[in-house]
Amino acid sequence: MATSDSRSSPSSSDTEFADPNPSSDPETNSERVQSQLESMNLSQPSEVSDGSHTEFSGGGDDNDDEVASANGNEGGVSNGGLLREGVAGTSGGEVLLRAENPVEMEAGEEPPSPTSSGYDGERGSSGGATSTYKADDGSEDEIREANVDGDTASQHEAAWLPGKRHVDEDDASTSWRKRKKHFFILSNSGKPIYSRYGDEHKLAGFSATLQAIISFVENGGDRVNLVKAGNHQVVFLVKGPIYLVCISCTDETYEYLRGQLDLLYGQMILILTKSIDRCFEKNAKFDMTPLLGGTDAVFSSLVHSFSWNPATFLHAYTCLPLPYALRQATGTILQEVCASGVLFSLLMCRHKVVSLAGAQKASLHPDDLLLLSNFVMSSESFRTSESFSPICLPRYNAQAFLHAYVHFFDDDTYVILLTTRSDAFHHLKDCRVRLEAVLLKSNILSVVQRSIAEGGMRVEDVPIDRRRRSSTTNQEQDSPGPDISVGTGGPFGLWHFMYRSIYLDQYISSEFSPPVTSHRQQKSLYRAYQKLYASMHVKGLGPHKTQYRRDENYTLLCWVTPDFELYAAFDPLADKAMAIKICNQVCQRVKDVENEVFLQGASPFSW
């Protein structure tokens, strides 16, 4: 593994990699879009600094269900300037919060007794041998989940079995203690509300222990955020009378784990609204279980999405690739529906947006869209018949109910119509009938099905600029060896990329291609992206514009401009100069197809 100094100086970010046309005024961004894309020429390579960081090792990214390892441009897209070589490999330091009296187990110490509600998640198999994919070598001897082969057209959505698993486990079970990642929701009286693994009723004692820790710290006039115990992080989130806790040894950052708890809380609010607080004010021992009956599958589906859905940390949504004219026609139909008194109308295919429209001056946050689509996709009742259900959008208005009309046209495609009126079922049904007639007549539903089957962008589709390659690699052209621009993955070792449009709050993620084929490899890469994203957005340490990281698993490159963010993964032996050039090609490719992969003019989602 290559090692070198990974320090980043502010002067480097301000000079060498500064935007050619810096401007903090959003209106000027659109004026400089065209000029920024006129030239894709890069400066000559400067000194290379390979930021080698073991924190991106996939060794701790085995399946959460397995035994824990002990080692453990306005209206469009712009390039915002060219990425130049000489990227400093900055260290993305995690925020470490002080924990009072952290609990650690000494070497050789016996695990606590089953009655002590102890958590023994670090015992088990050790990490696999170092290789290109060390994350794929973890042990699966003791605990292994059923793995259902997913649809090849939707590689990002790993196989998920509806409902909670391992309901027979409790805190006395050895298997339960060895889970790598737990989520708990409980009330301020210690009553369990949700647990990722096991039966909530059997975990009442463990929930009471968590509640006691939180209350003890609060009684001292403080608030507990994070406790570190060995390889474990215990992350707490207090939302009034609701306590959320994550216990993890997956090496994810504190910020990301806390963000996951925020989403879990938002999912609960989507079902119940924040008015649930008043119930606890009247009765501190209020039992929420009856109100959340049958929603275990919703929470479990959301937890599962943390390992495959970039929307959970990018806070953006993704669209199904469609011809521009067809998407615009669909948007026109949905806008006509909104004109009849509907707040939001959305046509979705799985977790991807086909098109949407909203009432004037109404805005919808991507997190609300994520939670809403998860609620619909994980609830079997929505698939069997048209439904009219009260829901709450926590980022839109956490105090009020909206009413959602949901109808599935087929197994993947569905429409959501949101209204403030509780008596609008028949009106929304009439809107849906008219909408469906137009979609069938124009053959839109067939095109949607064909698009989801074909998948999204692929790294193999990224074009290679032969002129640029010839100007920098003349010696390679003269050599009799194989063409290094062609091989596994995309050009010059490109394995995967994610592109987020900041103005549109949308992202596009390439389909996984060899060698990133297994669920565990994909999961490991996403966690590397999460850490890279967190390190680029740490308050007080930026602003960072570029990062270049190399370890035994990947070469990771991140590029942030006022208009977009790009995250790319390359072969660990990829050449840095060529990786930077390929990133420019990716941005150009996204620009070329932006009308097909992004929803343009999505004013309801601009805030």
Curated annotation (Swiss-Prot):
Q: Any phenotype upon disruption?
A: Severe plant growth defects, such as short root phenotype, retarded growth and dwarf phenotype.
Gene Ontology annotations for the cellular component aspect, listed alphabetically = endosome
Look up keyword Chloroplast and say if it applies: no
Keywords of the record, alphabetical order, are: Endosome, Guanine-nucleotide releasing factor
Tissue localization of expression is: Widely expressed at stable levels.
Spans of biased composition, class Low complexity? 1-14
The biased composition feature labelled Polar residues covers 21-55
Protein location? Endosome; Prevacuolar compartment
Region spans: Disordered: 1-173, 463-486
One record GO biological process: protein targeting to vacuole
UniProt KW Hydrolase keyword: no
- What is a single molecular function from GO for this protein? guanyl-nucleotide exchange factor activity
Pfam families in the record? Fuz_longin_1, Fuz_longin_2, Fuz_longin_3
Q: Which coarse location class describes where this protein primarily resides?
A: other
Q: What does this protein's UniProt record list under function?
A: Plays an important role in membrane trafficking through the secretory apparatus. In complex with CCZ1, acts as a guanine exchange factor (GEF) for RABG3F of the Rab7 protein family. Promotes the exchange of GDP to GTP, converting RABG3F from an inactive GDP-bound form into an active GTP-bound form. The RABG3F active form is involved in protein trafficking from prevacuolar compartments (PVCs) to vacuoles. May serve as a linker between Rab5 and Rab7 protein families in PVCs and mediate PVC maturation.
Q: How does it assemble?
A: Interacts with CCZ1A, CCZ1B and RABF2B.
Q: What else is on record for this protein?
A: Due to the stability of its transcription during plant development, this gene is proposed as a reference gene for transcript normalization.
Family per record:
Belongs to the MON1/SAND family.
Q: What is this protein called?
A: Vacuolar fusion protein MON1 homolog
The record lists the organism as Arabidopsis thaliana
Q: What is the lineage of its organism?
A: Eukaryota, Viridiplantae, Streptophyta, Embryophyta, Tracheophyta
- Which gene codes for it? MON1
